[in-house]
Structures are given as C-alpha cells and as structure tokens.
C-alpha cells in the first residue's frame, strides 16, 4: 500500500506541537516546503512502488523530504534521521502532522530508496523543478514552450546551453599496487580460515601471513621507495597471493568431495544434500574471492610486462566497478569515480550520462542538445562547450539546426581579424561557460560530489543524481526570492502611482482656476 499525504492537507497552522510558540512562516524550511511541487514529485516516485504486494510504504513526502535534508545539510544516513527527529521544522517539511520524538524510519531505508530511485527518476524530478522555476519568471524570460500544435512552424531557437564533464570521486582509499595486493592477501587469508573450519582437517595450509605482514610493515615505513624495492615487494606479495589462491582451490575441492560423500553438512545452516550447489562462503566473500583472482591476474600481467597499464583495472576490492579516470588536471592527474556529463541552463543543472569507464564526452553532445529540446520545446541559440566537443561531425550537426557555437575554428585561421566588438562579444560568451564549472565546484565543495559514500554502483549513481536535484532546489529558492522582491516592488510602485493619481485629481478639484462654469463649458 502506497502512503502519501497531499500537499494541500498539510498547513503550518494545523501542525500540532507541545511548545507554546507558533512556528515561524519565515523559516527557510517552511518557505522551501511551499515551493516544492510535492504532488508531482510523489507521482514519479510512486511509479517505482507496487500497489498489490509488499508491506505499507513510508509516506512518500517523508522520503522526498529526507533526501533533500540529507544532501542539503551534508549529513550521513544516521545523522539525517536523527536531525529529523530533533528538529520541529524538518518534521513539518517532511510531512508529519505533529511533532514526534521517535525516529521516522530506520537509517537503512535510505539504501532501499537509493536502489529504487535511479537516474531517470531524478531527471524527471529535475524537469519538474525546472518547470516550476520557469513559471516564476516573467513571460518574456521564460524558455519552456511545449504548448504548441504540431502543425505550427518550428519554434525559433532560444536560450544558452552549457555542457561539460567531470568526475564524482568515490570515497575509497587511494589505490597503490602495494596496498591493493596487501589487502587482497589479507582477504585471501580470511577466506582460508573460513574454508578450513568446514573441512575438519587437522593440518592447516601454510600461508606465511606473519612473514608477509612483517615485510609489509617494513616496506610501508620507508619514506622513499626506489623502483627496485617496489618491484621486489610486489613480486613477493604476488607469490604470497598465488599460494593462498592455490590453497583456496584445494580447500574448495576438498569440501565438495566431502559433501558428495555426505560427510559434512551443506553450508553453515546445516542443510544436508547429496550434490549441494551452495558455495561454502557468503555471497560477499564469494564476490571478494572472484575480485581477488582478477586483481592477481592484472597485477601479474603488469609485473611481467613491467608496465603500469591494464584494461579494466580494479583499484578497490570492495568496489570493483570503480575505475581510474585520467583527467590531466594540475591538482590530480587521475581521479577515481564515476564520470558524468552534465548541462546547465539558467542555473539549473542536469546529468545526462553517468559511466564508470573512461569515455570521450563529445559523444554526449547530441544527447544533451536533444534533452534540452525535450525539456524546453526548442533548440538553444548558443552552445558553450570545451574544444573536445566541437569536432567536425558535431559542428555539422549543430549547423544544420542553426545552433551557434563559440570556439576555435577548424583548419587554417581566418585572414580577416575580428574587430573590437566581435572580440568583446566572444570573450563575454566564453565567460558564460564558467557557470557549468561553478556548478561542479558547488557540488564538490558544498554537497559532497567529490566524496560519494555509497557502496554500490547503482546507489552511487542515485547519490550523484540527488546532489544535482538538491542544487536545483537551491537555485529555485533564489529565483523565488527574486520573484518575491520583484512582486513587492511592483506592488509598491503601483500603490505609489495610485496615490499620485489620487493626489492629482484632488488638486484639480480644489483649484479655483481650473474649475469651469456651465456657460464656459457650453
């Protein structure tokens, strides 16, 4: 059963609490609650829920509000639930009808929410926020123009689209070959201990874990490590890991043989089967075992070929989907996380593509321009992007749609130099591309885009998309404030004009020189 309390049933005056003072309507969470299109957002989220099976869901407004609170305040899952249970304004914002001390839900529910909400759902939420922000602007400044018949002529291009790519860094230990092999060796030793207990054998395989640990500590304490020392240490760790993997294979064969003879119970649960299919470890350990084998083969290949490159390189045992993304930045040449292609229009940002592998962002240009047309009903007038986007094929595609670009032309430079006006105009338009860079900086510095803490690939993508959704809400707040200031100014201006007209009419009535007799009128 899907639970949702409509927005028109929740008012600030009806919110009950044991405190003597009324809640302030000027609170930032009260103002934000009045701006958000709750019903439309809830309709998108409800499509991912089942109406026929499963237990009762948490109120959808609570789910949406908790996601906003989490990323707007930069809290973890437990901290978000604790903050909602302690703050009366946050409880009103999340849709509760009265103040309560108990936690609204368990923090682990956030994981299920992130699994359920993907990039498509968050993109639909962003479209709703963009439409809300566009409705607050004056009619001349609005960009969305979808309400037109198909028989009419195509709408003229309008607006400016800024596109760029960045990497959302994953929260993992900085990977080095030595540390990665050391962690893989420790995990292999742990798996050996688990399997050995199930064999019932008296002799445990020799793994040299104490010697390997001692060598790792001595190596890690060295401030400066030469290439010869690093290669020698990696070679030793590879041999330790190879021995452990061989022991694991033998233990697995031994366990399988014993189970077929019915000399051992199947799995830890005590299920006896003649031909059991269960792997003798948990799914997590089984996955780690597979990852360790891939790491060994990759590191062995690089060790034998004396290189530092390999396809689909694994940099973390527990998050094997993370790949090194070369960026060529001065601060950090290589980043570890998901590469995203994003666009920005009038302060509103969207994510069109998320990938855990390196890709050329120029392939996303057509996707991002078409997404702009789907949202606003027309193509942009101007496209601002890096030079990597402006290849020959993309330039031709943009020219066919009358989309202007700002960038260095291909081929030989023009013989006719630009005049002062053209130079100023080009520089001004190029500076507008800084807006999308500013969005990336805002996300990384204020909302944790450079520290994605989810442990799965799908939940990490949801985490990234939710950050952009919250940044759009922050922009919506600013647009609403400007709209309120403009409305107040116009209201005051109209009242002043009315008073001036009334004063002028009164002056005309009281002036004897301006009065006319009936004979003069005739």
Feature-to-residue mapping (PLM):
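Secondary-structure capping and boundary motifs in well-ordered enzyme cores
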Residues: 37, 54-61, 72, 102-105, ...
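Charged, often Cys/His-bearing segments associated with DNA-binding zinc-finger transcription factors
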Residues: 1-36, 481-522
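Active-site- or DNA-interface-adjacent structural scaffold in DNA-acting proteins
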Residues: 97-319
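Electropositive, glycine- and tryptophan-enriched low-complexity nucleic-acid-binding patches
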Residues: 321, 329-375
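Short, conserved catalytic/metal-binding motifs centered on acidic residues
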Residues: 27, 64-66, 80-84, 106-110, ...
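Basic, short loop/linker segments at the boundary and entry of helix-turn-helix/winged-helix-like folds
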Residues: 23-68, 72
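Acidic, metal-coordinating catalytic cores used for nucleic-acid/nucleotide bond scission
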Residues: 53-58, 88, 384-392, 411-412
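Helix-centered, glycine/charged polyanion-binding patches within enzymatic domains
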Residues: 387-457
């Amino acid at each position: 059963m899907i639970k949702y309390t409509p927005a028109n049933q929740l008012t600030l005056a009806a919110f009950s609490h044991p405190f003597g003072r009324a809640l302030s309507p000027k609170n930032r969470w009260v103002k934000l609650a009045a701006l958000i299109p709750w019903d439309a957002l809830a309709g998108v989220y409800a499509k991912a829920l089942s109406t026929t099976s499963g237990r009762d869901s948490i109120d959808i407004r609570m789910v949406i509000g908790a996601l906003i609170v989490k990323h707007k305040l930069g809290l973890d899952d437990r901290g978000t639930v604790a903050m909602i249970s302690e703050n009366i304004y946050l409880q009103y914002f999340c849709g509760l009808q009265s103040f309560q001390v108990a936690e609204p839900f368990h923090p682990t529910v956030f994981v299920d929410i992130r699994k359920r909400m993907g990039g498509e759902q968050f993109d639909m939420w962003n479209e709703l926020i963009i439409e809300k922000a566009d409705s607050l602007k004056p009619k001349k400044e609005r960009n969305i123009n979808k309400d037109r018949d198909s028989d009419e002529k195509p709408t003229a291009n309008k607006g400016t689209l800024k596109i760029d790519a960045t990497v959302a860094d994953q929260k993992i230990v900085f990977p080095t070959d030595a540390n990665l092999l050391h962690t893989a060796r420790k995990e292999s030793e742990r798996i050996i201990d688990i399997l050995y207990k199930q064999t019932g054998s008296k002799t445990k395989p020799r793994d040299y874990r104490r010697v390997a640990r001692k060598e790792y500590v001595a190596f890690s304490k060295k401030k400066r490590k030469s290439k010869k020392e690093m290669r020698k240490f990696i070679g030793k760790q590879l041999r330790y890991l190879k021995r452990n993997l061989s022991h694991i294979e033998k233990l697995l064969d031994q366990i399988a043989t014993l189970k077929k003879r019915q000399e051992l119970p199947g799995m830890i649960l005590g299920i006896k089967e003649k031909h059991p299919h269960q792997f003798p470890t948990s799914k997590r350990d089984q996955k780690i075992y597979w990852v360790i084998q891939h790491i060994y083969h990759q590191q062995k290949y690089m060790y034998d070929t004396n290189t530092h490159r390999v396809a689909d390189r694994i940099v973390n045992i527990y998050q094997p989907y993370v790949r090194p993304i070369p960026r060529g930045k001065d601060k950090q040449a290589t980043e570890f996380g998901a590469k995203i292609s994003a666009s920005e229009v009038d302060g509103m940002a969207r994510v069109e593509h998320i990938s855990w592998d390196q890709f050329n962002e120029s392939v996303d240009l057509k996707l991002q321009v078409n997404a702009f047309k789907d949202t606003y009903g027309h193509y942009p007038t101007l496209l601002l992007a890096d030079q990597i986007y402006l290849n020959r094929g993309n330039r031709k595609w943009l020219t066919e749609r009358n989309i202007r670009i700002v960038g260095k032309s291909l081929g030989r430079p023009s013989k006719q130099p630009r005049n002062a006006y053209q130079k100023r105009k080009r520089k001004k338009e190029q500076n507008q591309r800084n807006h999308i860079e500013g969005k990336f900086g805002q996300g990384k510095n204020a909302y944790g885009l450079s520290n994605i803490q989810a442990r799965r690939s799908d939940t990490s993508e949801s985490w990234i998309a939710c950050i952009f959704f919250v940044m759009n809400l922050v922009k919506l707040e600013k647009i609403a404030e400007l709209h309120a200031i403009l409305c107040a100014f116009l209201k005051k201006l109209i009242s002043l004009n009315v008073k001036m007209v009334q004063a002028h009419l009164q002056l005309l009535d009281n002036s004897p020189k301006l009065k006319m007799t009936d004979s003069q009128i005739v």
